[in-house]
Amino acid sequence: MADGIDRRTDDRLEFSTSKEVTVAPTFEDMHLKESLLRGIYAYGYESPSAVQSRAIVQICKGRDTIAQAQSGTGKTATFSISILQVIDTVVRETQALVLSPTRELATQIQSVIMALGDYMNVQCHACIGGTNIGEDIRKLDYGQHVVSGTPGRVADMIRRRHLRTRHIKMLVLDEADELLNRGFREQIYDVYRYLPPATQVVVVSATLPYDVLDMTTKFMTDPVRVLVKRDELTLEGIKQYFIAVEKEEWKFDTLCDLYDTLTITQAVIFCNTRRKVDWLTDKMREANFTVSSMHGEMPQKERDSIMQDFRQGNSRVLISTDVWARGIDVQQVSLVINYDLPTNRENYIHRIGRSGRFGRKGVAINFVTSDDVRILRDIELYYSTQIDEMPMNVADLLS
């Protein structure tokens, strides 16, 4: 498991996939550039995961592709490797564009592309809101092979003619369910309008609700599908529990009782609003507990430094909104607490997928008031999973 993907669970993933998709058992079988293969092995991959072995070849052939697989199965590397295979680094123009719902995810994708493309001399820029616009303009004018960004800033840079689109041959929508949800739909259309008509579209996500699949028909041509059946999306390897807290006010004491357990590893605590994140952070600190916190309203610099501290293990407990739930990979997180149950069931899998990345064991604990029982049952039904009452020895499951 040197590459961080657990082959035992990975081999059991069942794909509901287009007939023409074949499996490439090794990276060599994909006929990738020599310099790219070097980057892949240097990054720590030994052999492709289930989604990689099916999707990379199809994307490299130029096919529009919909790839769905669980959190932590190597989806980011799937499109990153494909992009690096198809771009021509001699041409200093943007040839691939990746759109993500959060700034942190866009930045993480940039670092994956840079690492995998380490021997290729690739230029990749993170084009995200909340950062200096002058720096964006300077980088884009210099010429970037790949741009990884958030829809608002990318659309702005295209309109200002700093992000030139005429050489773009691939558009990737990462965490497409969130991107295509209400907020970003218009901005994506905005970006898409400026792209050359022959642009290949790749859609990647852990969940693909029907309305998203329906929307992809508008800008994808005969897409090849690499899909995991929904019943398979139970996030094997992650133990899910609930704690019954009769009233909202009792959640805080319950969390304090759990604090010693949290710090055995690293934990993320999810709240539904930024006000709740701020309130809970203040209350925990007043009670002399060490926590850090993050939400979408914080300045980008502050968010970056909190993320860095957490990644390096300097902070062990992070309180956050759903801005953190999508695709952020911190290897040491093995406990997620839903202080508030997510308001939509798709976000549940994104949140608890933060623990147990790449097939490692993880634990998810849901605080459930009497008002929440219905939501919990709905989540169980949707993912065909069972969420049991938390046992007393939860600490043993983490150590």
Swiss-Prot record:
<dbReference type="InterPro" id="IPR014014">
    <property type="entry name" value="RNA_helicase_DEAD_Q_motif"/>
</dbReference>
<dbReference type="InterPro" id="IPR000629">
    <property type="entry name" value="RNA-helicase_DEAD-box_CS"/>
</dbReference>
<dbReference type="Pfam" id="PF00271">
    <property type="entry name" value="Helicase_C"/>
</dbReference>
<dbReference type="GO" id="GO:0030874">
    <property type="term" value="C:nucleolar chromatin"/>
</dbReference>
<keyword id="KW-0539">Nucleus</keyword>
<dbReference type="InterPro" id="IPR001650">
    <property type="entry name" value="Helicase_C-like"/>
</dbReference>
<keyword id="KW-0067">ATP-binding</keyword>
<feature type="short sequence motif" description="DEAD box">
    <location>
        <begin position="174"/>
        <end position="177"/>
    </location>
</feature>
<feature type="domain" description="Helicase C-terminal">
    <location>
        <begin position="237"/>
        <end position="398"/>
    </location>
</feature>
<keyword id="KW-0694">RNA-binding</keyword>
<dbReference type="GO" id="GO:0006364">
    <property type="term" value="P:rRNA processing"/>
</dbReference>
<feature type="short sequence motif" description="Q motif">
    <location>
        <begin position="25"/>
        <end position="53"/>
    </location>
</feature>
<dbReference type="GO" id="GO:0005524">
    <property type="term" value="F:ATP binding"/>
</dbReference>
<dbReference type="GO" id="GO:0016887">
    <property type="term" value="F:ATP hydrolysis activity"/>
</dbReference>
<keyword id="KW-0698">rRNA processing</keyword>
<keyword id="KW-0690">Ribosome biogenesis</keyword>
<keyword id="KW-0347">Helicase</keyword>
<feature type="binding site">
    <location>
        <begin position="69"/>
        <end position="76"/>
    </location>
    <ligand>
        <name>ATP</name>
    </ligand>
</feature>
<dbReference type="InterPro" id="IPR027417">
    <property type="entry name" value="P-loop_NTPase"/>
</dbReference>
<keyword id="KW-0547">Nucleotide-binding</keyword>
<keyword id="KW-0378">Hydrolase</keyword>
<feature type="domain" description="Helicase ATP-binding">
    <location>
        <begin position="56"/>
        <end position="226"/>
    </location>
</feature>
<dbReference type="InterPro" id="IPR011545">
    <property type="entry name" value="DEAD/DEAH_box_helicase_dom"/>
</dbReference>
<comment type="similarity">
    <text>Belongs to the DEAD box helicase family. DDX48/FAL1 subfamily.</text>
</comment>
<dbReference type="InterPro" id="IPR014001">
    <property type="entry name" value="Helicase_ATP-bd"/>
</dbReference>
<dbReference type="GO" id="GO:0003723">
    <property type="term" value="F:RNA binding"/>
</dbReference>
<dbReference type="Pfam" id="PF00270">
    <property type="entry name" value="DEAD"/>
</dbReference>
<comment type="function">
    <text>ATP-dependent RNA helicase involved in 40S ribosomal subunit biogenesis. Required for the processing and cleavage of 35S pre-rRNA at sites A0, A1, and A2, leading to mature 18S rRNA.</text>
</comment>
<dbReference type="GO" id="GO:0003724">
    <property type="term" value="F:RNA helicase activity"/>
</dbReference>
<protein>
    <recommendedName>
        <fullName>ATP-dependent RNA helicase fal1</fullName>
        <ecNumber>3.6.4.13</ecNumber>
    </recommendedName>
</protein>
